[in-house]
């Protein structure tokens, strides 16, 4: 019956699928990565960028554990920026503009070189399950492969439906067919399924953009790599450009809002809160006359530009009017239309903390199928699912990431315990221990774990050991070395500490300076860590506390508009109910306790 046997089969070669396949193969499993189109491996279907606040943390943690997204981003980046630098290092976020074609090429090169991994261009149309355990898959070529575990990483392809104004048609991504047979098969499994939607803006011919009317945006003078395997970035940079919509843009959208698939009632799926369409912005922020737009190059060898901030499901004739009403885009040519896409997703409460379905052994889900949005969230889930699929296939115990491990654990716990009612995006505010879970120390926190799990290779482990040795030496030296009679360890705790002068006095090289900066941040945050642990203990103490019958959530200080809205719609009777409410962050719970006078 079976053509071949694989230990692990990964369905879909987007960001989740690539990491899942790489992790499983690294752990010694014979792994099949199945994709409709081999040339689309690692495709960046929407924005040509990786990272951001919270998202960059996921990429750093993924890299520290032996993942590949950070390495490929460094190889393919055309502009690098560290976001939030005016704030503390705990919330600094790495972000890079990416050459989309280079990213695909570099990702495929890594996967092609990965031992134990086979890539096939075939659409999986059926999961073969016996006695509530996966045993194989069937492809559109009528080939049947037996396997020990399966990772489903289908992105927006499960019964994907594209909307451009009044027009709608089945598609997994513009130009690619949807996965209908597998969607039907998964529906038959009895899992709780819903529909989400996402959107993307038009792409322009950059040669038709008048950059003289736009503001140039460059990256950091000294780019910071994503991967701890890289000490510096050696790639040419490309600028982005900042524009603004106009009053005319607003008028065009208001006049044609009934033709938007989002507002005509044509779309039923729920979209991402933090990536609204331009129609949403005009409707929800009526007082604003203009909105900022970023023009981002899609690569070195293409003229295409991504219009960040103008995601839309308007018909194509309205898209032309909208684009040409933006200053600098009066003569712009659209080369690809913007669109919205609806797709099937499985409620993540159907999963356990290893991303295995509770109903079926050996069946793991990763990425947008779990209700998340973003390349980074997908990639992190891919590693978790691939790791555990491999361990299941080898009859080893599963590994569960906990919230205290980092953003990996925070994301999975949020998904499987709270579920989602809109696409989930990572933010630093979701972590109780965000001052500990920093980007700069991700390797110090997680590379030993990755090594223990078998995900970290020899070169990465040797690099970690060298860095750890240097950290320990600098920690000891900073306690003994004095500047103006004061130990360096005390100077580093001061907010006005000039790290450059300290390094100069200690005669440290650039690499040692980076390690000293990590130690400095550890020192600064050590006191805050104790405070947060105390706050978490207080939250646990008052979990069963009954709330007053009527609370005016608008009077609780420092709650975001999302948290207020969710609490107003909920029927929370205890502190535990507040904690369990989707979208309520740990900091919000602490603020509520303060408001209630619970010390």
From Swiss-Prot:
Which keywords does this chain's UniProt record carry? Cytoplasm, FAD, Flavoprotein, NAD, tRNA processing
Primary localization: cytoplasm
Question: In its keyword annotation, does this UniProt entry include Cytoplasm?
Answer: yes
User: Where does the record say this protein resides?
Assistant: Cytoplasm
Could you tell me one molecular function GO term of this UniProt entry? flavin adenine dinucleotide binding
Which of this chain's residues are annotated to bind NAD(+)? Answer: 271-285
Tell me the GO BP annotations in alphabetical order. tRNA methylation; tRNA wobble uridine modification
Cite the binding residues for FAD.
Answer: 12-17, 124, 179, 368
Q: Name one GO cellular component term.
A: cytosol
What family name appears in the similarity comment?
Belongs to the MnmG family.
The record's NCBIfam families line, in alphabetical order, gives: mnmG_gidA
In its UniProt entry, what is this protein called? tRNA uridine 5-carboxymethylaminomethyl modification enzyme MnmG
Give me the gene this protein comes from: mnmG
């Amino acid at each position: 019956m079976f053509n071949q046997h694989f230990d692990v089969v990964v369905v879909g070669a987007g960001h989740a699928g690539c990491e899942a396949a790489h992790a499983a193969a690294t752990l010694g499993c014979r792994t099949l990565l199945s994709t409709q189109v081999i040339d689309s491996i690692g495709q960046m279907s929407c924005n040509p960028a990786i990272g951001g606040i919270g998202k960059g943390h996921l990429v750093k943690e993924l890299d520290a554990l032996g993942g590949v997204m950070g390495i490929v981003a460094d190889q393919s980046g055309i502009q690098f920026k560290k976001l939030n630098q005016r704030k503390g290092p705990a919330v600094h976020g790495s972000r890079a503009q990416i050459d989309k074609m280079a990213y695909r090429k570099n990702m495929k090169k890594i996967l092609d070189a990965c031992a134990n991994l086979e890539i096939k261009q075939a659409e999986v149309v059926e999961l073969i399950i016996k006695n509530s355990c996966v045993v194989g898959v069937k492809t559109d070529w009528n080939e049947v492969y037996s396997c020990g575990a399966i990772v489903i990483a289908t992105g927006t392809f499960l019964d994907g439906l594209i909307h451009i104004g009044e027009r709608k048609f089945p598609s997994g991504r513009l130009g690619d067919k949807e996965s209908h047979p597998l969607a039907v098969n998964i529906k038959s499994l009895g899992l709780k399924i819903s529909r989400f939607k996402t959107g993307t803006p038009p792409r322009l011919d950059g040669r038709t953009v008048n950059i003289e009317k736009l503001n140039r945006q460059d990256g950091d003078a000294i780019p910071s790599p994503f991967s701890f395997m890289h000490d510096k970035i050696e790639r040419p940079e490309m600028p982005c450009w900042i524009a603004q919509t106009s009053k005319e843009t607003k008028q065009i959208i208001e006049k044609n809002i009934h033709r938007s698939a989002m507002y005509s009632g044509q779309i039923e799926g729920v979209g991402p809160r933090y990536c609204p369409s331009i129609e949403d912005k005009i409707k929800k922020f009526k007082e604003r006359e203009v909105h900022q737009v970023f023009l981002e190059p899609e690569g070195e060898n293409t003229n295409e530009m991504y219009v960040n901030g103008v995601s839309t499901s308007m018909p194509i004739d309205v898209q032309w009017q909208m684009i040409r009403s933006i200053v600098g885009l009066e003569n712009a040519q659209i080369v690809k239309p913007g669109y919205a896409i609806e797709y099937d997703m499985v409620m993540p409460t159907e999963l356990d903390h290893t991303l295995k379905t509770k109903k079926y052994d050996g069946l793991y889900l990763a990425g947008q199928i779990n209700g998340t949005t973003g390349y980074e969230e997908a990639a992190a889930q891919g590693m978790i699912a691939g790791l555990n699929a491999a361990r299941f296939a080898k009859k080893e115990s599963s590994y569960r990431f906990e919230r205290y491990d980092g953003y990996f654990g925070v994301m999975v716990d949020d998904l499987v315990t709270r579920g989602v009612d809109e696409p989930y995006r990572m933010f630093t505010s979701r972590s109780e221990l965000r001052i500990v879970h920093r980007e700069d120390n991700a390797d110090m926190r997680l590379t030993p774990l990755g090594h223990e799990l078998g995900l970290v290779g020899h070169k990465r482990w040797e690099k970690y050991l060298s860095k750890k040795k240097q950290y320990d030496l600098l920690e000891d030296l900073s306690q003994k070395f004095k500047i103006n009679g004061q130990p360096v360890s005390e100077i580093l705790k001061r907010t006005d500490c000039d790290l450059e002068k300290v390094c100069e006095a200690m005669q440290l090289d650039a690499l040692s300076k980076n390690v000293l900066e990590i130690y400095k941040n550890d020192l600064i945050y050590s006191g805050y860590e104790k405070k947060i642990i105390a706050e978490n203990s207080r939250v646990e103490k008052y979990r069963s506390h009954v709330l007053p019958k009527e609370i005016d959530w608008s009077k609780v200080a420092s709650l975001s508009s999302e948290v207020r809205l969710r609490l107003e719609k909920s029927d929370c009777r205890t502190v535990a109910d507040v904690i369990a409410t989707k979208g309520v962050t740990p900091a919000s719970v602490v603020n509520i306790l303060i408001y209630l006078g619970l010390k």
